[in-house]
Amino acid sequence: MTGAAGAAGHDDGGALFDSAAVVGGEIVLRPWRPGDDLALLEVWGDPANAQQHQDRAMLAEDAERPWRRALVAEAAGVPVAAGVVYASSVHPRRLWLYVETAAAERRRGIGRALVAALRGLAAEAHAAGAIPTTALKARFAKDALVPGVAGADPQTETDGATGRPPVDTDAVRSQTAALAAGTEAFLVAEGFTPVQRSRRVAIAPGAIGLPDVRGEEHPDGVVLEEASTGSVELTQAVTAFYDAVHAWDPSTLSVGAAQQLLLGPATGAAGAVVLRDAPKAEGGRIRAFAVSYTPERQDAPADVLVGWDPELGEKDALQAVADLLALLVAQYPVQIEVDEAMAPLERIVDGLIGGNAARTLVDTYVFVDDTTGA
């Protein structure tokens, strides 16, 4: 397939950006402009899963801080594909890349043309000192139970109790698998390799045996305390954990940024608990923590961030995470994110999945291309 875009310049007015020869004719590339999301939805259809729904949100008008460039591919004047590349202030080592082509227009080289043009824009910005790298990362779901329609949840809609039609999880999985196969082949052909796996997992209530909680009957039991999401101590713990599990994509997350991006009011953080080796009043340190992003208990699993002190040894970290998770799911289900880099949590979750006490809602893979980095 042909599809390499020629040398291109950026046009802030949203006019013709460049043209590219593809199988079956030629396409026009131009900057993203208002209304493109609706026009593309007509040819793309609804996203196949929750991950694709999230990734489509990357597509937006160009910006300088954070730096972003988005292009739309038109065939015969009709938008059929789009792509975006943008920089993250928290993870400066690589730029995010997302490209999507209408199903009827795939295998014509349109995606390749978009990637080539976006790489060119990144190279220009890097040469001008606007961004620190041209290395890229992209992600896609290999499996999913959660559809791409906002508000749909397989946990609460399998029986139609919400008034919406039940989620057809088999259809979601089938569509996701088909899309993933094509996406992975495309990324590999573009020089990308896998670097990380990230899963959103729902854990059933009572899935883990409860530990003894410190009290008169159990003076050596675990110490569980509530913590303010504005706490400096909690924010420092979250920052240390985040940095430790992102060694594969190093972060520049300051304590202030962690408070804003992970714990602040805009995140929806509704409360937190910490597991200590002794009461705080006695100088006890945080061994593990959980931050809830669900304001009230409900039938659907609460969205929770679980982390631990990265200075703990493997055995101690495993125990701290198991104890905290057991207390979290004592009565209600939760859903958590677990990455390959989160070894203690991944080990526990894999055991729960194997015992049918947990299930994967979305299974996402991250691929990278570092060949053109800084």
Task: Please give the residue ranges for each predicted region.
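Conserved beta-hairpin
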Residues: 58-61, 67-85, 259-291
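Anionic, Ser/Thr-rich low-complexity intrinsically disordered regions
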Residues: 11, 16-23, 28-31, 38-41, ...
